[in-house]
Every structure is written in C-alpha cells, then in structure tokens.
C-alpha cells in the first residue's frame, strides 16, 4: 500500500519532488527484504493516463517479467512511439534515499534532473524492485513490441537524429562514467549520469518530440540483507558473522563496433593432466582480458580467450559457433560446432553439438563439462589430457543487444531426476487409489437370515 501511494502520487502530477523522494525513502524498506537480484525501474512519459494504479506494489513485492509487461503494454500501445532506455551499470533503490533530495535538501540531490522530469511528467511510474531477469530481457521486449531495432546513441548522435512521432524508435542510452565508477565516488557517478539525462531530455524538449523514458540498471549497486534477518531473524547469536554474498561478475563481451559475443559462467575451471585451475577470476571482470583472434559475422563467430602463463605455457580457448537457416522451422538456429584448446602447438578438440538454440536466444546450461558426473556435454573423439567444467554456463553470439543476454534456451531435458521422481510418486499414489477404489466397489452386503444352502423358508397363512 505504501508503494502504491507513492506511484499514485507521482502519476497524477500533484505531488511535489520532495514528497516523491521522501516516499522513495520509505519504499526502500521494501527493497531491504529482497535479495540482491532486484533493481529499480523508473518510467515517465509526455502523455497522460498511461498507467493505472499499481495494486500489487507493496512492501517486499518484487515485480516479475509478466507483471512488468502489463505495466509497459499501455505505454507502448497508446503512448508515444519514441522510447528512451537509460541503462546504468549499477543502481539500487537505496541510492535514491542516500543521494536524493529526500527532505527538501535539493541542492545536495544527485538526481535533480530526474526529479524535475518526474515532477513535470503527466504520467510516471516507480517500481522499486523489479526482478533481474525481467530487466535483462527488457531491451528485447521493447524491440518486439515496437518493431524497431535498438539504436545506441549518445548526445552527439541524438542531436543529429530526426525523430518522427509516427515512426517507432528505440533509443538505448548507456550512461557514462560506469566503466571508471570504481575510481569515483558514488555521488559523482550518479550526478554525472543525471546530467546526461537532463541534456537528453532538453534536446527532445527543444525538438518537441513526444517520448516515453525508462531508467534502470544492469545490476544492483547494493547487497540487501536476507529476508530472514529483516523479518524474523533480528536476534543474532553471540559471535555470529553475516556471510557475504558472492559477487556477480559481468560477462565477457567481445566488441567490434558493438557488443557481438557474450560469455558468462559462475565457475570456469580447466585441468591439464588432472591438475585443476580456476580461471573464473582471470576471465570475468578483467579489463585486459586477451581476446586476440576473436571475430564475428552474421553466420559465424569465434570467441578466443588466451591465458599466459597457464600450466607453464600459453593456452588459448576457442569457442566456435555458427548460425544457419532451417526451412523446416523457418528460423535461424545457432550451434557451437566445437571447442578448441591450443597449447604448445597441439590442439584438443571437444564436440559440443548439444549447445544449440534459436539464434535470437542465448544458451544456458547448469553444467557444460567433460566430466561424466556433470553431464559430459564436452566430448572428445580421442582421450585428452585436458578437462573443462563450466558451471551455470551462458553464451550468445548472434542478435546481441547491448551487454545483456536475450532469453535463454536451457539444456535441461524434460525427464530430469526431479520430474522422474514426481512421475513415479504420482503413479504409485494413483495405483493405491485405484486399488482401494476397486476394493470398495467389490464389497457385498450379506443377509444373515439368508442361507443359500438350506431349504427355502415358507410360511403358511392361517386364517
């Protein structure tokens, strides 16, 4: 109810900016009980009455992808055809509380332009906690609804564009300063991003272009406490320490003029002659990762990762993928043709033909490994001294939009161990029910005065 009041107050345009930021600080309580996989989403438009009251936005509520689509559909179908997506690297609802003008202290607010835009917008919507999966597919969803490919723009490019109110346009604006945010204070990063938002909106206002804008982030900037600590576990034991959540590293991205290949894994380990090494920290989140040899086109892609020294030599891993059109399904499908490991002039080949899916999707699998206990998706024709295991593996080499994966085609089969267990349990219970019903229907009532073996009893009527 609290968050619904916030959204309603902003939407009608009667609430002032200080009230909005004070309300956002209260909504931050809802995000405190969520996990680290939620980010806020702020929407506003130059048209009126695009969003109905949000009845489900209460403390602790997390907006799913299906609920988000119900909020976005009216704006995309009835609102302006020009959509702006401001995408930050990190953002959490707590940032609005910590760095916004919550109590009227507007001179210290890091969101002055955003605050002004929401205050003047005829329609606006604030969702404090949106599921990370819904945000990761937001660009693809907007592209499908608008029927327009996303266009990565900056301030210089935006001034040269001639936007038309009748033609759909999806403008993706990656806010700057994110690459060097580790060297800057959070307030400076947010202030710089807010200035970019203000300049973009000023450009659209000068051209009198109707628009719908959205501000969100790739991942949260703050790790929220677990719900058990907030709701029911406030009493801590003596000498108890809070376990730190593992950091979520960004995917490896190969770029030429734009991001072309995305690769991610929760754990990336290789073994040479049964000596295992973890390459996760050497691969993800590393600025100087050696991608020499990688290339991409519409039908063929190769991601090349080089490490030196590794096992005393220079080792290169090559993920080779191809995209082909299949008339039967009338769509393009991609497949990873092979995985190569180059070292000391020798090459080890792994067949990974099961890594496949529609080209508009990414591929995800819990384990892609040469170890038989973990699925054995990496197959070699001859015995090899190399072994590899990728945990929570995900890759996309075609139709990449920004640095976010599209919907994932998962490797999980239908008859998984859990499904088999459920089916067998259901069949067993059904057998017991059928047998019991059969026994009940087979019951016959016995007349204790009826003796089928003896003579029939006859009664003579005496008058």
UniProtKB/Swiss-Prot annotation:
The segments annotated as topological domain Cytoplasmic are: 434-463
Identify the tissues in which this protein is expressed.
Expressed in brain cortex (at protein level). Highly expressed in islets of Langerhans. Expressed in pancreatic acini, pituitary gland, adrenal gland, lung, brain and bone marrow.
Q: Which residues form the signal peptide?
A: 1-32
- The record lists the membrane-crossing segments as 413-433
- Please spell out the taxonomic lineage of the organism that makes this protein: Eukaryota, Metazoa, Chordata, Craniata, Vertebrata
- The name this protein carries in UniProt is V-type proton ATPase subunit S1
Q: Which family does it belong to?
A: Belongs to the vacuolar ATPase subunit S1 family.
Complexes and interactors: Accessory component of the multisubunit proton-transporting vacuolar (V)-ATPase protein pump. Interacts (via N-terminus) with ATP6AP2 (via N-terminus). Interacts with RNASEK. Interacts with TMEM106B (via C-terminus).
Propeptide, residue positions: 33-225
What the entry lists under InterPro entries is as follows: Ac45_acc_su, VAS1/VOA1_TM, VAS1_LD
PTM comment: the record says: N-glycosylated.
Q: Which Gene3D superfamilies match?
A: 2.40.160.110
Question: What is the protein's known function?
Answer: Accessory subunit of the proton-transporting vacuolar (V)-ATPase protein pump, which is required for luminal acidification of secretory vesicles. Guides the V-type ATPase into specialized subcellular compartments, such as neuroendocrine regulated secretory vesicles or the ruffled border of the osteoclast, thereby regulating its activity. Involved in membrane trafficking and Ca(2+)-dependent membrane fusion. May play a role in the assembly of the V-type ATPase complex.
**Entry GO terms, CC:** clathrin-coated vesicle membrane; endoplasmic reticulum membrane; endoplasmic reticulum-Golgi intermediate compartment membrane; endosome membrane; synaptic vesicle membrane
User: Keyword Disulfide bond on this protein?
Assistant: yes
**What are the BP-aspect GO terms?**
cellular response to increased oxygen levels; endosome to plasma membrane protein transport; intracellular iron ion homeostasis; osteoclast development; synaptic vesicle lumen acidification
Answer yes or no on keyword Disulfide bond: yes
Q: Which cysteines are joined by disulfide bonds?
A: 365-411
| Topological region Lumenal | 33-412
């Amino acid at each position: 109810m609290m968050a619904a009041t916030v959204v309603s107050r902003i939407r009608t345009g009667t609430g002032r900016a200080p009230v909005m930021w004070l309300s956002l600080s209260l909504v931050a309580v809802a995000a405190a009980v969520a996990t680290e996989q939620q980010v806020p989403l702020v929407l506003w438009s130059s048209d009126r009455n695009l969003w109905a009251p949000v009845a489900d936005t209460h403390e602790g509520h997390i907006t799913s992808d299906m609920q988000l689509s119900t909020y976005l559909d009216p704006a995309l179908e009835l609102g302006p055809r020009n959509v702006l997506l401001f995408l930050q690297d990190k953002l959490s609802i707590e940032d609005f509380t910590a760095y916004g003008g919550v109590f009227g202290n507007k001179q210290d607010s890091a969101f002055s332009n955003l605050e002004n835009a929401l205050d003047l917008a005829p329609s606006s919507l604030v969702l404090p906690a949106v599921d990370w999966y819904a945000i990761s597919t937001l660009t693809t969803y907007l592209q499908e609804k608008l029927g327009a490919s996303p266009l990565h723009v900056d301030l210089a490019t935006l001034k040269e564009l001639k936007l038309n109110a009748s033609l759909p346009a999806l403008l993706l604006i990656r806010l700057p300063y994110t690459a060097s945010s580790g060297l800057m204070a959070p307030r400076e990063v947010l202030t710089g991003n807010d200035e970019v938002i203000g300049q973009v909106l000023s450009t659209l206002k000068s051209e009198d272009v109707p628009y719908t804008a959205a501000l969100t982030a790739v991942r949260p900037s703050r790790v929220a406490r677990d719900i058990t600590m907030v709701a029911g576990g406030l009493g801590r034991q003596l000498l108890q320490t809070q376990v730190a959540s593992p950091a979520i590293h960004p995917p490896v991205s190969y770029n030429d003029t734009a991001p072309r290949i995305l690769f991610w894994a929760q754990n990336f380990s290789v073994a040479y002659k049964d000596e295992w090494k973890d390459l996760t920290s050497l691969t993800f989140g590393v600025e100087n990762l050696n991608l020499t040899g990688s290339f991409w086109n519409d039908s063929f892609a190769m991601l090349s990762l080089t490490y030196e020294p590794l096992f005393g030599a220079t080792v290169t891993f090559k993920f080779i993928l191809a995209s082909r059109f299949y008339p039967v399904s009338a769509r393009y499908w991609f497949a990873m043709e092979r995985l190569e490991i180059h070292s000391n002039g020798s090459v080890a080949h792994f067949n990974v033909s099961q890594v496949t899916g529609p080209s508009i999707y990414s591929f995800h699998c819990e384990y892609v490994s040469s170890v038989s206990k973990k699925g054995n998706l990496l197959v070699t024709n001859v015995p090899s001294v190399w072994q590899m295991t990728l945990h929570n593996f995900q890759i996309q080499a075609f139709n990449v939009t920004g640095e976010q994966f599209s919907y994932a085609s998962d490797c999980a089969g239908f008859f998984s161990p859990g499904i088999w267990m459920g089916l067998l349990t259901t069949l067993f219970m059904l057998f017991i029910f059928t047998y019991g019903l059969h026994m009940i229907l087979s019951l016959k009532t016995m007349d204790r005065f009826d003796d089928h073996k003896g003579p029939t009893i006859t009664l003579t009527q005496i008058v």
